[in-house]
A protein has these predicted regions:
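Conserved aromatic beta-strand anchor motif in extracellular beta-sandwich/beta-rich domains
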Residues: 89-93, 132
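Short edge beta-strand/loop segments characteristic of extracellular beta-sandwich folds
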Residues: 72-80
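Short, compositionally biased P/S/T/A/G/V-rich stretches that sit at domain boundaries
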Residues: 38-69
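Short, exposed beta-strand-loop hairpins at the edges of beta-sheets
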Residues: 119-146
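Aromatic sugar-binding surface patches on proteins
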Residues: 108-117
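Bacterial N-terminal signal peptides that target proteins for export
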Residues: 5-27
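Solvent-exposed serine/threonine-rich low-complexity stretches and specific carbohydrate-binding patches
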Residues: 98-108
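C-terminal motif of bacterial Sec signal peptides marking the signal peptidase cleavage site
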Residues: 33-36
């Protein structure tokens, strides 16, 4: 009888060891999966830039609010820290949206997300509104001119 009890105890220890190994593997998988999903905090926008060119880090290089008809308009949305979100930029002329662009982003540090708009022909002369929206919430509307 002691041999049977010892064998049963040994089998129980093996099963418990296997169970613990499976639990450890499952926990490790969950930790890695959570890390791979990226930031879950909202994007922390710290500045919006408009201009005529971009730097290599995607921030605006030549800040401007006045453009010529053949220029490309650049917008850079600067964020700080860990966060994720959807950024939409809408360009409007005469009360009508003439261009819209959206990007899903996820950052762990300072970042710049760039958008650009170049007219197929020349931009009509006049006033333009550039609206920046993050996760469906309008953050700011900038006014620029084409002269």
């Amino acid at each position: 009888m002691p041999q049977v009890r010892q064998r049963i105890d040994s089998e129980r220890l093996v099963r418990e060891g296997v169970l613990m190994a499976v639990l450890r593997a499952a926990c490790l998988f969950l930790v890695l999966a959570a890390a791979a999903c990226g930031p879950t905090e909202p994007l922390n926008v710290v500045a919006i830039q408009t201009g005529k060119s971009l730097n290599t880090d995607h921030s605006v290089g030549n800040h401007a609010t006045s453009f010529r008809p053949k220029d490309t308009m650049y917008v850079s949305v600067l964020s700080n820290g860990r966060g994720a979100g959807t950024i939409t930029v809408k360009w409007s002329f005469g009360g009508q949206v003439v261009h819209e662009a959206t990007k899903k982003v996820s950052y762990n540090d300072q970042a710049a997300t760039d958008f650009r708009f170049q007219a197929a022909d020349d931009f009509p002369i006049g006033d333009y509104a550039i609206e920046v929206i993050v996760d469906g919430k309008s953050l700011e509307t900038r006014r620029v001119k084409v002269e």
